[in-house]
């Protein structure tokens, strides 16, 4: 966690490769079977950021990752059924928290856990997607329910309500997206 949190400073000072190259091969010795899926996803986020910072954190991209990060990252990725890359899931969906836990997800209540350069632009670029995903949740659930209705040949009166949920949620997502220029200019 400390190393992943240090990425912006390590990139700024061109020390990311030096620090990673000098890690003990066993610096990550967690028994992954004793961790929850959320914890494993967090490990994946951390290693994804470390690996990509290592590769792109110097004038010339690195072509090989040190085993101190590549071996655990591969194990973690395999457990999650994902390739070892910094995917949308790792960069966005598994990489945020609410600032105030008992408040709704909103543009003013979401923050990144990890980033590359610790800038407001990077945070905003990712957190807007968290809010859009949250706003779209009801439409996705309604769409899945509609698909199930068609699959079961049991279309009923509730179908029109599901369509209205999709439309309503789509409008919420559009509103969230439209606030981007306002917030980005701050």
Task: Identify what each model region corresponds to.
Residues 176-182:
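Conserved small/polar residues in nucleotide/adenosyl-binding loops
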Residues 1-24:
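Intrinsically disordered, low-complexity acidic/proline-rich regions
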Residues 108-126, 142-155, 162:
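Short, charged/polar, low-complexity loop and linker segments
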Residues 24-110:
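Long, charged all-alpha helical bundle/coiled-coil segments in cytosolic proteins
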Residues 32-35, 39, 120-131, 155, ...:
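Non-transmembrane, amphipathic alpha-helical segments
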Residues 127, 131-134, 138-141, 145, ...:
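Charged, amphipathic alpha-helical oligomerization/scaffolding segments
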Residues 15-18, 39-45, 134-138:
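Helix-boundary capping/turn motifs
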């Amino acid at each position: 966690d400390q190393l992943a949190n240090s990425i912006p400073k390590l990139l700024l000072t061109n020390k990311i490769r030096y620090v990673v190259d000098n890690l003990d091969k066993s610096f990550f010795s967690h028994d992954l079977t004793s961790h929850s899926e959320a914890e494993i996803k967090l490990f994946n986020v951390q290693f994804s950021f470390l690996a990509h910072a290592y590769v792109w954190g110097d004038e010339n991209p690195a072509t090989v990752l040190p085993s101190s990060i590549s071996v655990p990252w591969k194990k973690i990725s395999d457990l999650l059924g994902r390739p070892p890359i910094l995917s949308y899931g790792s960069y966005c969906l598994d990489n945020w928290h609410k600032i105030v836990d008992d408040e709704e997800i909103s543009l003013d209540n979401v923050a990144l856990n990890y980033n590359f350069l610790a800038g407001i632009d990077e945070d905003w670029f990712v957190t807007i997607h968290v809010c859009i995903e949250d706003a779209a949740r009801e439409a996705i659930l309604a769409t899945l329910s509609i698909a199930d209705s068609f699959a079961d040949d049991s279309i009923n009166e509730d179908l029109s309500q599901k369509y209205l949920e999709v439309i309503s949620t789509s409008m919420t997502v559009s509103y969230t997206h439209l606030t981007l220029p306002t917030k980005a200019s701050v």
